[in-house]
Amino acid sequence: MTHKRDSAPFRNFLTSIFLIVFLFSPSEKPPVFGQSITQQDQTILPSSDFNPCIRILSIDGGGVRGIIPAAVLERIEEETGEPVSRLFDFISGTSTGAVISLALTKPSEKDSQKAQFSAKDIVGFYERDSRILFPPPSTETEENRFLTSTKYSPEPPLNIFRQTFGKTGLKKSLVPILVPTYNIKEKKPFFFKSWVKSTNDYPMSEVARAAVAAPGYFPPVELPAHRQTSSPKQTMVLVDGGVFANNPMRYALENSYQLGNIRKGIFLLSLGTGKTSPEHPRESPYHWEEAQWPSPLKNLLFADPPISNQESSSQITLRMEPVIPAENAAMDNAREQNLLTLRNISKQMMNQNRPAFKRILRILKTPRPAGCFREGNLPD
C-alpha cells in the first residue's frame, strides 16, 4: 500500500536540523565542537534532558574504511549493553555501510527476535575477510580487469555474503533498513526498503552484493524488478549507491520521519568512514572506462544532497567522522597494518571526544517517551 503525504512538512523538517560534526586529525589536537565544519569555535552538545522518540543510524560507504564506523558501534554496544538493533529504530547504509546495517539487523537462526551478529563480529569481518574481497595485485586480478573492466572478481563477495546471510530475506530485518543503489538500466536511484510489502523480498546476500558493486571495482548486479507484479523478464542493473549518496543521512531522514511522533524528537547518528585533510583531498574511489558507464552516473558521483545546519530543540543530527591520512584513504587497502591504523583512528576519535560520546550513549540508553510510535506508516 502506497502512503501519500505532503512533502512540505519534510522540507520544513530538513531546514530545522542541527548538525554537529566531529572532525580531527590523528596527529593534532581535536577542535572544539561547532555548528559546522568551518565554524568550530564553541562547544555545543545535546542538552542532558534531550530524549528523542526516534533514533536513526546512518552509515557512509567507503570500502575497508567501514571498520571506522564498525568500531564506533562496537564501543556503543559494549557501553550500553544493548545490540544496535535495539538502540536504533531505523538504519540506512551505503555500500560498506549497507553491509554493516544488514549484518547488525539479521535475525539469529536460534532466536528470530535477536541479532545474529554483534558490532564486534563486524569488526572481525573487516579484519578477517577484507583481503579476500580486495586481494593484492596479481596476475589473476589483472586478468579480471582485462576481461570485465573491473578490478576484482564478484565471486568472493558473493560467497562471503551467502555464508553470512544465508537465505534470509531483507524483510526479516529486525528494524527498518534502507539501502541506496543506482539502477544504470533506468538511470535512476533504487532504494531497497525492508518494510515495503508490495516489493519482492530480496535475499540480504543479494542486497549486500548490489550495495558494494562499486564501478571499476566490482561488476553491476542484475536482479529481478522490484515489484511483485513485474514480469520475470524485467530486471534492474544495480551499482553501489555511493555514486549519488555516499552519505545516506538525508534519505534516512526522509524515509523515517513518519515512523513516530517527530514532535517528541528525532536523533540521527551519522557515521562517516574518514575524510582526508583539505591539503590532501581523497580521489574518488570509483573509476570506470568512459564507454562502459552512462554519463548521468558520472555526473552523480558523490553528489550528496546538502543538509541545513540550523538548530532545533527536537531534532539533532550528530556526525562522527575522523580526518585520516591520505595513505590510509584507499577503499581497497586491505593490508593488516592499514586496518589496524583505521581502527586506532576510530578509537582515538571516541576517546578525544569523550564528553560528546558519553552524551550519545546517554541518549541511546534512555527509554523512549510514551506515545512515540505509529504502526504501518512508513512511506513506500
Mark where each language-model region is.
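Extended hydrophobic secondary-structure segments that form protein cores and membrane-embedded regions
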Residues: I56-I59, D89-S95, F125, I177-Y182, ...
